[in-house]
Amino acid sequence: MKDKLIVFDTTLRDGEQSPGASMTREEKVRIAKALERMRVDVIEAGFPVASQGDFEAVQAVARSVRESTVCGLARALGADIDRAGEALAEAESARIHTFIATSPIHMKRKLRMEPDQVLEHAVKAVKRAREYTDDVEFSPEDAGRSEIEFLCRILEAVIAAGARTVNIPDTVGYNLPEQFAQLIRTLRERVSNSDKAIFSVHCHNDLGMAVANSLAAVMSGARQVECTINGLGERAGNAALEEVVMAVRTRQDSFPCDTNVDISQIVPTSRLVSGITGFSVQPNKAIVGANAFAHASGIHQDGVLKERQTYEIMSAEDVGWHANQMILGKHSGRNAFRARLRELGIELETEEELNAAFQRFKELADKKHVIYDEDLQALVTDANLAAENERFKLSWLKVVSETGETAIASVTLSVDSIERQASAPGSGPVDAAYKAIDSILQSNTELLLYSVNSITSGTDAQGEVTVRLKKNGRIANGQGADTDIVMASAKAYVNALNKILYPVERAYPQV
């Protein structure tokens, strides 16, 4: 029987460190529930000591998730660990993940500690975490640049203190696959009590090696991989969950282990994370990119038509891709709508959410004669993009634009439940709409990114707009979808403004 490879998802913690990817409490819970449906083993929900908002988000995930272990991150400090323990108190299965830096440069320049002091802090942290849960994980930050002798000493000490999992992070993505594999082999051989703990890896993608390093470590005995949906993460990102899982599943001839992940949930969860964070998935992204299973070459197309396995090493349907087919129309009922959402891996938690989504579906069906799966996913995502405690809502928009003339936009916004109106000229319909919104909110933000993607084909297709705003060093993403591209643009802008003008303050550490 093959070993189990534990999948530890840190989209809600490390993934959220991507500039502009901040999530509200409700959005975190929605993603956590999707990860639970995917049968992810461990969900790292956040860093509870960072802020009251993050504490409440971890607490909400702990209350909502029953099948997966919920994890909270904590530095090797008593206050951090206590806060994590409090946030996880109602979890069905809880883990505290504590860490301290072990590389010479970090110990000297950042911690200003001697190695023996670092070891002492690590042991105390693990023992304190064990007061809250038996499931404790320890990470030596920047392990990839740490001295092997000290790394062995500290791992041996924390395992003896009660750590069930020891995680080896390549914090700055510096290692190459064979180097990282050798590091894991060496640690497992030289740490005398290594058989008492699961070895885990957490790889960053600065050199494009995160997935390769993770898989090399698995081949060397690691039995937990820390990763994120779509590879989301700070700088160049983290190891992509979908790539790690499908590499192990597809190459069972080479790997001595497998995961419990329900791979049919990969694409729906990828789209959910993309919609909530505003980070689009590149078309050529493995597994979840729009072109991942597209064949342009005539020879390839001919081969696939004759036998799919000639050029496809996995099935698109297996990972959650569905044919671009007409499925519903304006005469479709509520039960058919609910059933199709479930087939797409979309679960609405309450009847109120279902009713609201169904109403939006009916409105869309009046505009479009053909409704595709992609339309439904965009519709549900768009319905859930509202920021927590949303203060601004787009009530009405009218734009007049003629050839050779300046566009004029008139906007009505609900600001703290009070309707406010404004009009403004612009160099085009979108510019005019944004200026009208700005004249109401006086936002003084900088537009860093504006992009439009067609959700489906056809002249009546929905457009999905992504914007990225910057204000006082903060960055926020927003998304909106509509058959009217100007309306989609205004929705995305208001969505981003809700996030950037009233953000949740966080101060995450990096592991």
UniProtKB/Swiss-Prot annotation:
<dbReference type="GO" id="GO:0030145">
    <property type="term" value="F:manganese ion binding"/>
</dbReference>
<dbReference type="InterPro" id="IPR005671">
    <property type="entry name" value="LeuA_bact_synth"/>
</dbReference>
<keyword id="KW-0464">Manganese</keyword>
<dbReference type="InterPro" id="IPR050073">
    <property type="entry name" value="2-IPM_HCS-like"/>
</dbReference>
<dbReference type="GO" id="GO:0003985">
    <property type="term" value="F:acetyl-CoA C-acetyltransferase activity"/>
</dbReference>
<keyword id="KW-0479">Metal-binding</keyword>
<feature type="binding site">
    <location>
        <position position="238"/>
    </location>
    <ligand>
        <name>Mn(2+)</name>
    </ligand>
</feature>
<dbReference type="InterPro" id="IPR013709">
    <property type="entry name" value="2-isopropylmalate_synth_dimer"/>
</dbReference>
<feature type="binding site">
    <location>
        <position position="204"/>
    </location>
    <ligand>
        <name>Mn(2+)</name>
    </ligand>
</feature>
<dbReference type="GO" id="GO:0003852">
    <property type="term" value="F:2-isopropylmalate synthase activity"/>
</dbReference>
<dbReference type="InterPro" id="IPR013785">
    <property type="entry name" value="Aldolase_TIM"/>
</dbReference>
<protein>
    <recommendedName>
        <fullName>2-isopropylmalate synthase</fullName>
        <ecNumber>2.3.3.13</ecNumber>
    </recommendedName>
</protein>
<dbReference type="GO" id="GO:0009098">
    <property type="term" value="P:L-leucine biosynthetic process"/>
</dbReference>
<dbReference type="Pfam" id="PF00682">
    <property type="entry name" value="HMGL-like"/>
</dbReference>
<comment type="pathway">
    <text>Amino-acid biosynthesis; L-leucine biosynthesis; L-leucine from 3-methyl-2-oxobutanoate: step 1/4.</text>
</comment>
<keyword id="KW-0432">Leucine biosynthesis</keyword>
<keyword id="KW-0028">Amino-acid biosynthesis</keyword>
<keyword id="KW-0963">Cytoplasm</keyword>
<comment type="subunit">
    <text>Homodimer.</text>
</comment>
<keyword id="KW-0808">Transferase</keyword>
<dbReference type="Pfam" id="PF22617">
    <property type="entry name" value="HCS_D2"/>
</dbReference>
<feature type="domain" description="Pyruvate carboxyltransferase">
    <location>
        <begin position="5"/>
        <end position="267"/>
    </location>
</feature>
<keyword id="KW-0100">Branched-chain amino acid biosynthesis</keyword>
<feature type="region of interest" description="Regulatory domain">
    <location>
        <begin position="393"/>
        <end position="511"/>
    </location>
</feature>
<dbReference type="InterPro" id="IPR036230">
    <property type="entry name" value="LeuA_allosteric_dom_sf"/>
</dbReference>
<dbReference type="InterPro" id="IPR000891">
    <property type="entry name" value="PYR_CT"/>
</dbReference>
<dbReference type="Pfam" id="PF08502">
    <property type="entry name" value="LeuA_dimer"/>
</dbReference>
<dbReference type="GO" id="GO:0005829">
    <property type="term" value="C:cytosol"/>
</dbReference>
<comment type="similarity">
    <text>Belongs to the alpha-IPM synthase/homocitrate synthase family. LeuA type 1 subfamily.</text>
</comment>
<dbReference type="InterPro" id="IPR054691">
    <property type="entry name" value="LeuA/HCS_post-cat"/>
</dbReference>
<dbReference type="InterPro" id="IPR002034">
    <property type="entry name" value="AIPM/Hcit_synth_CS"/>
</dbReference>
<comment type="function">
    <text>Catalyzes the condensation of the acetyl group of acetyl-CoA with 3-methyl-2-oxobutanoate (2-ketoisovalerate) to form 3-carboxy-3-hydroxy-4-methylpentanoate (2-isopropylmalate).</text>
</comment>
<feature type="binding site">
    <location>
        <position position="202"/>
    </location>
    <ligand>
        <name>Mn(2+)</name>
    </ligand>
</feature>
<feature type="binding site">
    <location>
        <position position="14"/>
    </location>
    <ligand>
        <name>Mn(2+)</name>
    </ligand>
</feature>
